[in-house]
């Protein structure tokens, strides 16, 4: 299989699973946890709905560990995530520990044609792709610090993945770049974003249309510390793994036009996207790592059954009229992605809050 467009010649022998057309079945979906911590209920919510979307369509499910940041990811978190997914009744066909064997130490065995399935083992692939894009003039070095970006863009929160960027370094001359490097400035790599609108049909939210300017302008593909950015790693892995369906939280909605831009530059067919509502605590805030006291691992330790968690999540998603315990597989027969709520879901909406969930259910 020839890798198209800007991807480097060295990748042409890389294992590439071509995505079928949108009308082809079965679908290929993915679970893509990142291991900077243990799984919380918000993660479980997203993984359950993504799993149901693939399995209800008779599709193939890939588990990909998004551990690209070495400073935040730890092997014990990756093993715990796999254990918790299994405990919740979620399985997969490709990736680590397909057979359920999770060693206490060392690497988990992988199964499938598109590995490696840990992003940390795919760094050479990302670097080769960036080198090819650099040679093609698609990227440029940016020497701006976060402080400078805040001052330039008036943005209170700036990060490498999606800060509003005014294009300060886009047209620097070679001499201006040398001057910055001589002062010890380290550069990230940014995409020269194409103009125009990116349209896509979201499986839950309907027709979507963005310009990349709407999403912050030229975005980083590699951070100044050398770590590849989320947008590049995810888009490239989805393409090379033949992913045709991506179900994820609506907080990542504006990542989609960025990933569509990359896929278009590389010549890949994009997957179908569906952005699901977020799960909120009783104060109306998104469940996140600060809620680890009520993470899946802690709930297991307290004796809460997986079926109880699935039952509550099913009720919140509108998949069941009550919260009776049940297995994830029990939801498959009647699951329809388009029936999920469009608005974020608050735990306080439950008609009767289980005791184990009460700490998260202060009034919104």
Q: What residue spans do the PLM features occupy?
A:
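Non-catalytic terminal extensions that flank enzyme cores
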Residues: 1-38, 56, 61, 177-179, ...
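N-terminal Rossmann-like or analogous alpha/beta NTP/dinucleotide-binding catalytic cores
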Residues: 2-157, 250-251, 255-268
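Noncatalytic linker/hinge segments flanking ATPase motor cores
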Residues: 40, 103, 112, 116-120, ...
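Alpha-helical structural motif
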Residues: 77, 125-129, 165, 255-258, ...
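Short, surface-exposed acidic
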Residues: 93-95, 270-273, 319-326
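Short linear loop/turn motifs
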Residues: 99-114, 147-150, 277, 313, ...
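Short secondary-structure transition/capping segments
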Residues: 114-131, 157-160, 185-195, 316-330
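Active-site cores that bind ATP or allylic diphosphates and position pyrophosphate for catalysis
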Residues: 147-288, 295-300, 352-364
């Amino acid at each position: 299989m020839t890798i198209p467009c800007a991807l480097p010649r060295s990748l042409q022998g890389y294992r590439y699973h071509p995505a079928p057309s949108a009308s082809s079945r079965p679908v290929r979906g993915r679970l893509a946890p990142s291991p900077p911590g243990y799984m919380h209920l918000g993660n479980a919510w997203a993984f359950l709905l993504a799993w149901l979307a693939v399995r209800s369509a008779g599709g193939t499910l890939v588990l990909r560990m998004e551990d690209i940041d070495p400073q935040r990811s730890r092997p014990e978190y990756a093993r715990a995530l796999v254990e918790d997914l299994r405990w919740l009744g979620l399985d997969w066909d490709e990736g680590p520990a397909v057979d359920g064997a999770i060693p206490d130490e060392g690497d988990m065995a992988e199964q499938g044609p598109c590995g490696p399935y840990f992003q940390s083992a795919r760094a050479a692939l990302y670097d080769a792709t960036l080198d090819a894009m650099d040679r093609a003039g698609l990227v440029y070095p940016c020497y701006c610090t976060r402080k400078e970006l805040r001052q330039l863009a008036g943005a209170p929160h700036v990060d490498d993945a999606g800060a509003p960027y005014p294009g300060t370094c886009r047209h620097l001359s070679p001499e201006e770049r040398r001057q910055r490097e001589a002062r010890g400035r380290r550069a990230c790599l940014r995409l020269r974003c194409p103009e125009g609108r990116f349209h896509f049909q979201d499986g839950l939210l309907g027709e979507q249309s963005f310009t990349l300017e709407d999403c912050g302008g030229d975005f980083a593909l590699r951070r100044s510390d050398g770590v590849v950015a989320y947008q590049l790693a995810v888009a490239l892995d989805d393409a090379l793994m033949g992913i045709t369906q991506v179900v994820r939280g609506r907080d990542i909605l504006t990542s989609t036009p960025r990933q569509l831009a990359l896929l278009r530059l590389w010549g890949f067919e994009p997957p179908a996207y569906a952005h699901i509502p977020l799960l909120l605590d009783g104060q109306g805030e998104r469940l996140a790592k600060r809620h680890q006291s009520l993470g899946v691992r802690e709930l297991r330790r307290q004796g809460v059954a997986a079926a109880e968690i699935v039952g509550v999540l099913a009720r919140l998603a509108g998949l069941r009229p009550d919260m009776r315990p049940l297995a994830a597989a029990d939801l498959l027969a009647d699951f329809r992605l388009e029936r999920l709520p469009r608005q974020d879901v608050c735990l306080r909406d439950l008609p009767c809050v289980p005791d184990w969930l009460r700490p998260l259910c202060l009034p919104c």
